[in-house]
Amino acid sequence: MKYSTLVSIAAFISTSLAATVPDEHYSTLSPSAKIPSGASTDFSGTFGIQVVTVESASALSTDTATSTLTRNDNKKEATPVAQITDGQVQHQTTGGVSAIKQISDGQVQHQTNAAQPIAQISDGQIQHQTTAKATATPVQQINDGQIQHQTTVQPVAQISDGQIQHQTAKATATPVQQIGDGQIQHQTTVQPVAQISDGQIQHQTVKASATPVQQIGDGQIQHQTTAAAATTASAVKQINDGQIQHQTTTAENVAKAQSDGQAIATGSPSSNSTLSDDDDLSSTIPKACSSANNLEMTLHDSVLKDTHERWGAIVANHQFQFDGPIPQAGTIYSAGWSIKDGYLYLGDSNIFYQCLSGDFYNLYDENVAKQCSAVKLSVIEFVNC
């Protein structure tokens, strides 16, 4: 009787461990497809990521790493994605493109906001404001009956020739203006992705500017979406759970990493080089000042980690998040990461998907739902400022 009881207890313990402890070979869970030629499985220093939307699904088979990233040479600063505590990556969807953040559980989310109303000015033209405010703003009509659309809390201006111009501010969205010839101009800025504490990645979506990805405490990545113009790169942030969040406000955000949200990627470093300031490839990677709550990652031997030593992994539901000190049970990929042409790769692919979940977009390695859209993860190198 005692013997059978001991056997039952031992069986229960082994079953419990199997459910909570991943396979001991988790560090070799990489895609079967090899990393592309010329990619690097090592990066000297820390870096963040910025969400870049792929223009069309039909372009996925022929799209190159540099074709979808519009760089502003006049802008010298790029803002990264942030990470929250759980390690998840989230992208907020508030009216514009904002940075990705990572929350404590490691998921990636993208928040969304409501659109603003159209105003009509005296000339009869219709204007539509594109600022990141949650409340709707009315349409204005000018003298000639045209309707103008304001892109910020500020009004649209018209110069002597009748053209309409829209100024682009780095930290806040500026209004559309009209110059003397009647043409309309619109300025743009880009914001980074952030990571919150859970490791999730969030990406806010601002019309006027793209914000960085952030990571929250659980390692999830979130990307917020607010209304702002996009011309300056903003960083991803990380919160306590390791999730990655990307805010979409007009202000530039830097990729931040907090308590538990790490990311790791393994690969074959023998055939690849390490990126550094002296390498030609580093010239394609924008630089940004690091700050609190930004998703900061390291890449060694194709293993991706955050500053909390959490693994960057694709978990059972195909979501990209940071877990640690070792990946969670059921992890699909925990290695095979690399950098090429300024983009983050998993295996031979640099295409990921942001999928709307409530107020945020989560990041996945596959198209798991109809509300998902293809994106790329642009690398931002952090420097001391």
Curated annotation (Swiss-Prot):
Record's keyword annotation contains Repeat: yes
Keyword annotations of the record: Cell wall, Cell wall biogenesis/degradation, Glycoprotein, Repeat, Secreted, Signal
GO cellular component, one term: yeast-form cell wall
GO molecular function per UniProt: structural constituent of cell wall
Stored InterPro entries: PIR1-like_C, Yeast_CWMannoprotein_PIR, Yeast_PIR_rpt
Positions of PIR1/2/3 repeats: 78-96, 97-115, 116-133, 136-153, 154-171, 173-190, 191-208, 210-228, 233-251
Residues the record marks as carrying a glycan: 272
GO BP: any one term: fungal-type cell wall organization
Inactivation phenotype: Increases sensitivity to calcofluor white and Congo red.
One Pfam family hit: PIR1-like_C
Induction remark: Expression varies during the cell-cycle with a peak at the beginning of G1. Expression increases in hypoxic and acidic conditions and is down-regulated during the switch from yeast to hyphal growth and under low-iron conditions. The promoter contains E-box consensus sequences (CANNTG) suggesting that PIR1 is directly regulated by EFG1. Expression is also regulated by ACE2, HOG1, and RIM101.
UniProt family annotation: Belongs to the PIR protein family.
Function: Component of the outer cell wall layer required for stability of the cell wall and specifically for cell wall rigidity.
Protein name (database record): Cell wall mannoprotein PIR1
Gene name for this UniProt entry: PIR1
